[in-house]
């Protein structure tokens, strides 16, 4: 059954309005009736509740995000399962995803890109210090608040460095346009994987396009492994292009 406004989860979280619909579920604005704050609640789609792998990945998102306390990572407050549904309660971050910003503005000023990259890198460093690799850094997982603060979201496929993966050996996890070469080759991810993906995000924001293209996901993945990215436009400051 699809979530509806007024529905209550965990006897305390009342759904107010839908924020977004993603591949695994829906995100709603909700009121916490116990302590009186407004939160975001992600609800796993019904069709995935019968799949142990999806349910475990959903639980893992709660566990992983809770490992890191950093201003650049959206807080997770609660997790629950009831009546055939699973839900994740998170900090409600005002603003929009970087993907929406890029769709609207196409290219961002170098100063703004550097600011976003620095904030994201600091948050990733905190995650890496906790032994956590995000594995899916992309514009859609970077929320930009009205004051220009970056918040990383969606630790659903993140992995602890010393943890047995949730997926089969050699299975590729992540979004192909932002995959690091080792991910594209089915090898284990590391903190450098996130750094590479952040570099792809920066390239896209500066150039208005992604560095690697192809007619299929496989072709794009192979380009990540075998090709060097095209040079950034000469209109971008030299020190930024070198970085």
Task: State what each model feature region is.
Residues 43-67:
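AlphaC helix of the eukaryotic protein kinase fold
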Residues 83-97, 101, 105:
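Conserved short submotifs of the Hanks-type protein kinase catalytic core
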Residues 207-211:
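Structural helix C-cap motif within protein kinase domains
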């Amino acid at each position: 059954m699809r979530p509806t406004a007024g529905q209550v989860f965990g006897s305390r979280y009342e759904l107010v309005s839908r924020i977004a619909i993603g591949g695994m579920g829906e995100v709603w604005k909700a009121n916490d009736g116990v302590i009186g704050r407004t939160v975001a609640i992600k609800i796993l789609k019904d069709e995935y509740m019968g799949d142990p792998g999806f349910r475990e990945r959903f639980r893992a998102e709660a566990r992983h995000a809770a490992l890191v306390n950093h201003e650049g990572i959206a807080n997770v407050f609660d997790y629950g399962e009831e009546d055939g549904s699973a839900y994740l309660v998170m900090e409600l971050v005002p603003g929009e995803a970087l993907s929406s910003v890029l769709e609207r503005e196409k290219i961002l000023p170098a100063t703004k890109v550097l600011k976003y990259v620095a904030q994201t890198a600091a948050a990733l460093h905190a995650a890496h210090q906790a032994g956590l690799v995000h594995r899916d850094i992309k514009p859609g997982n970077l929320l930009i608040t009205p004051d220009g603060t970056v918040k990383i979201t969606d630790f659903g496929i993140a992995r602890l460095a010393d943890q047995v993966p949730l997926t089969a050996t050699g299975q590729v996890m992540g979004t192909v346009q932002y995959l690091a070469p080792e991910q594209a080759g089915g090898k284990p991810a590391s903190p450098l994987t996130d750094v590479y993906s952040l570099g792809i995000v920066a390239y896209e924001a500066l150039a208005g396009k992604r560095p690697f293209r192809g007619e299929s996901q496989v072709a794009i993945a192979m380009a990540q492994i075998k090709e060097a990215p095209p040079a950034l436009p000469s209109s971008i400051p030299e020190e930024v292009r070198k970085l």
